[in-house]
């Protein structure tokens, strides 16, 4: 019996060996260096016998003229070639001009994918057939990590007219504005720390009366602080009340009841010297003005303000920067997942490979480190699994690939980095998380096709009356009345009716 068993085993071994020869058994795939999630495994389409694919990518803005840009992309391509048998050929648009990017799509230029954002013409380009629509079946097959980790609202926000067109960023962030101000001036005038908008007004009036050679307030996020947040409005020109999910409606802020009090407040700021007459034409953004000591107060989203405060703390510790949220306890909504993302172009010859690449950018710790922080040993060091940034990296070796806003995944980054936040930020963030609500219109995208002329006319009117935002018009009541009349003449009623129609249709199919 034992002899027969040995013969059988010998024959079986020969069969296995022959099978391996005939099928050219390949060795196991190399490690991808990712987080180890099964979602990060390369899909079946990435086979060893495929020819390597080069994917053309268009990035926002100009290519950096300093730093290790080419070196970073070379390292990225080594990982992509190893894991997905492809590389990226990165072209920088050269500017942040959305119309320049739209021309590339309109001209049928062949490239595979590109940076995109909801504020950078996403909906318009999608409606103009610039992008390839993505199906959920494709996403489940080629982007399993993204499907697993993004909420349904992200894919709804990435959709236009019921079709998914964007691969959204995996960032759970808030866009609500908070305030940074000069703590040294607060001490100088023996004032208590600021907690409310009234406190902020008193501080700014004091600075305006007593400080020379310094503007008080930059124009960034002024509308948000004095209109959007107190009235729970999400949006810029058109917005919705995000605390009232039972009555979804898009309203034109300039036509809303809150606009006249806001306009009068801006005039008050101008008359009290909080706004200068030159502010309307100043091309320096408020963040840089604050960092350079040109203004005493600035506002922006919470993450940006924290980073500004950290930077100024190092460059000017004597300014004793303070940050605060004047609307602690207010309801908030998460920032759009489509604030930054990727789109697959209509002309792409390798759409599913693009989806794989974007999924891998998000699921790989190696790629997250490269694309957001640079090269280990040059830009940062790892100790006990945590990242520490290296100071004084030579300019030619420093991490700098320009726009990488769409390449960050908070879920992965949190596993190896503890991001430094300014004092007070954690309490503000915790308050946001405690008071987060959702609203159906977070996923609504307006199609302006039927009212394109009227929308353009209204935009021209808004620019014409931009001085209201800076308090430059003395008779505010008359100015606002004229502004609203001009909006009416430009086609406001038709645009409003189109918004109402589309919102009604959207709500009829929402979550159906």
Briefly describe each language-model feature range.
Residues 2-3, 12-13, 21-512:
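Extracytoplasmic/secretory soluble proteins
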């Amino acid at each position: 019996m034992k002899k027969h068993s040995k013969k059988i085993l010998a024959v079986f071994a020969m069969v296995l060996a022959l099978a391996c020869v005939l099928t050219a058994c390949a060795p196991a795939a190399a490690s991808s260096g990712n987080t180890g999630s099964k979602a990060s495994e390369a899909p079946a389409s990435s086979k060893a016998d495929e020819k390597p694919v080069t994917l053309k990518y268009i990035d926002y803005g100009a290519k950096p003229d300093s730093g290790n840009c080419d070196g970073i992309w070379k390292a990225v391509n080594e990982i992509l070639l190893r894991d997905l048998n492809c590389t990226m050929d990165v072209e920088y648009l050269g500017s942040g001009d959305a119309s320049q990017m739209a021309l590339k799509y309109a001209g049928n230029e062949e490239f595979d994918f590109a940076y995109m954002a909801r504020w950078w013409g996403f909906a318009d380009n999608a409606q103009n057939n610039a992008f390839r629509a993505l199906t959920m079946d494709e996403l489940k097959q080629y982007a399993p990590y993204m499907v697993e980790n993004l909420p349904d609202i992200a894919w709804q926000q990435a959709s236009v007219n019921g079709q998914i067109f964007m691969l959204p960023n995996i960032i759970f962030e808030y866009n609500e504005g908070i305030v940074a101000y000069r703590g040294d001036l607060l001490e100088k005038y023996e004032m208590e720390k600021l907690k409310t908008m009234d406190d902020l007004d008193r501080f700014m009036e004091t600075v305006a009366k007593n400080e020379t050679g310094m503007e008080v307030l930059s124009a960034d996020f002024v509308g948000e602080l004095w209109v959007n947040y107190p009235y729970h409005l999400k949006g810029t020109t058109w917005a919705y009340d995000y605390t009232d999910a039972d009555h979804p409606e898009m309203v034109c802020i300039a036509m809303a009841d809150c606009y006249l009090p806001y306009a009068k407040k801006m005039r008050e700021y101008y008359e009290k010297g909080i706004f200068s007459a030159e502010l309307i034409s100043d091309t320096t953004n408020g963040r840089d003005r604050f960092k350079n000591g040109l203004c005493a107060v600035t506002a922006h989203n919470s993450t940006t303000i924290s980073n500004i405060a950290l930077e100024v703390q190092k460059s000017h510790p004597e300014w004793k920067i303070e940050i605060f949220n004047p609307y602690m306890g207010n309801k908030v909504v998460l920032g759009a997942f489509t604030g930054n993302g990727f789109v697959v172009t209509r002309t792409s010859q390798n759409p599913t490979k693009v989806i794989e690449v974007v999924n891998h950018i998000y699921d790989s710790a190696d790629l997250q480190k490269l694309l957001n922080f640079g090269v280990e040993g040059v830009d940062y060091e790892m100790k006990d699994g945590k990242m520490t940034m290296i100071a004084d990296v030579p300019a030619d070796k420093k991490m700098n690939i320009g726009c990488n806003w769409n390449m960050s995944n908070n879920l992965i980054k949190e596993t190896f980095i503890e991001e430094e936040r300014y004092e007070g930020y954690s309490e503000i963030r915790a308050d946001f998380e405690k008071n987060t609500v959702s609203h159906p219109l977070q996923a609504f995208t307006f199609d302006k096709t039927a009212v394109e002329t009227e929308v353009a006319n209204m935009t021209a009117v808004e620019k014409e009356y931009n001085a209201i935002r800076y308090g430059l018009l003395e008779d505010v009541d008359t100015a606002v009345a004229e502004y609203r009349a001009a909006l009416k003449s430009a086609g406001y009623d038709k645009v409003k009716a189109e918004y109402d129609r589309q919102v009604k249709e959207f709500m009829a199919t929402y979550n159906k």
